[in-house]
Amino acid sequence: MIGLAVTTTKKIAKWKVDEVAELTEKLKTHKTIIIANIEGFPADKLHEIRKKLRGKADIKVTKNNLFNIALKNAGYDTKLFESYLTGPNAFIFTDTNPFELQLFLSKFKLKRYALPGDKADEEVVVPAGDTGIAAGPMLSVFGKLKIKTKVQDGKIHILQDTTVAKPGDEIPADIVPILQKLGIMPVYVKLNIKIAYDNGVIIPGDKLSINLDDYTNEIRKAHINAFAVATEIAYPEPKVLEFTATKAMRNALALASEIGYITQETAQAVFTKAVMKAYAVASSISGKVDLGVQIQAQPQVSEQAAEKKEEKKEEEKKGPSEEEIGGGLSSLFGG
């Protein structure tokens, strides 16, 4: 008797084939892929994010194994993604810079109802007015939470706005159903991004969030320092050379005045200095030698003039001010 080996081929569902084909196409046509953990994430909030990203990015929620097959089909190194393809994920396809996309998402504060154990993201205030809750056992709950109430027309009315939790506080479990009844959502919802893959580079999700103010200040400081160095070394750029030429002129005039070199610009300073020295010499010997002339008091430089002179020296030491530097920043870097 001859044994026959029967081979059966499992038919792959058409929706899976279509899903992989769609994912493969998206992987080939977008430079940035973001993988986000959506475990416990409300479906309605994901829909809100999808609407906000319309025109910027596409969001797909699919099985990890189908995404992995699509990665292979699109020519990606699947090993780069292995550790992130666990649990329920959403896959975001975009050509927008991932940092810009994260900044865009962070501007929208999506909220959800509180669950027992949640911490408040903002101050939770129960407003005064009709709660719509029938009087009965719930009155003791309000009393426990120190919320002043009265019963009117068989309903519980809150007498005054009452804070039941501050940011960072755990929301009392007893208040959770009341908050839901009143339509109060005190917990923010945001996508937990695992990684972004941008032009061949894996960026961990926690590195995508940047403080824009701090970042701007750092760039400004770097700009100012670069401009100061450029001014010091006389970097040949028009805006830099304006400051460099001014500084060189001041130094040249100071040197010329010091050595007594007379030009139209230095003549007054040279002669003034010579007169001052002559007064000083005459005053020092007038008591010992009869000069045949009366030595008048040496002209005094006013305190205000002296202060201005000191300020000028200080300015020369410091170089251009931050305001002056700020005006030349964009020119220095081609802006």
Curated annotation (Swiss-Prot):
NCBIfam families: PRK04019.1-1 (NF003095). Residues 326-335 have a biased composition (Gly residues). Transmembrane segments: none annotated. The keyword Nucleotide-binding does not apply. Pfam families: Ribosomal_L10, RL10P_insert. Belongs to the universal ribosomal protein uL10 family. Part of the 50S ribosomal subunit. Forms part of the ribosomal stalk which helps the ribosome interact with GTP-bound translation factors. Forms a heptameric L10(L12)2(L12)2(L12)2 complex, where L10 forms an elongated spine to which the L12 dimers bind in a sequential fashion. One of its GO terms (cellular component) is cytosolic large ribosomal subunit. Residues 305-321 have a biased composition (Basic and acidic residues). InterPro entries: Ribosomal_protein_uL10, Ribosomal_uL10, Ribosomal_uL10-like_insert, Ribosomal_uL10-like_insert_sf, Ribosomal_uL10-like_sf, Ribosomal_uL10_arc. Forms part of the ribosomal stalk, playing a central role in the interaction of the ribosome with GTP-bound translation factors. HAMAP family: Ribosomal_uL10_arch. GO terms for molecular function: large ribosomal subunit rRNA binding; structural constituent of ribosome. SUPFAM superfamilies: Ribosomal protein L10-like. The gene is rpl10. Keywords: Ribonucleoprotein, Ribosomal protein, RNA-binding, rRNA-binding. GO terms for biological process: cytoplasmic translation; ribosomal large subunit assembly. This is Large ribosomal subunit protein uL10. Was called L10e in this organism; in this case 'e' is for E.coli-like, not eukaryotic-type protein. The keyword Lipid metabolism does not apply. Residues 300-335 are annotated as: Disordered.
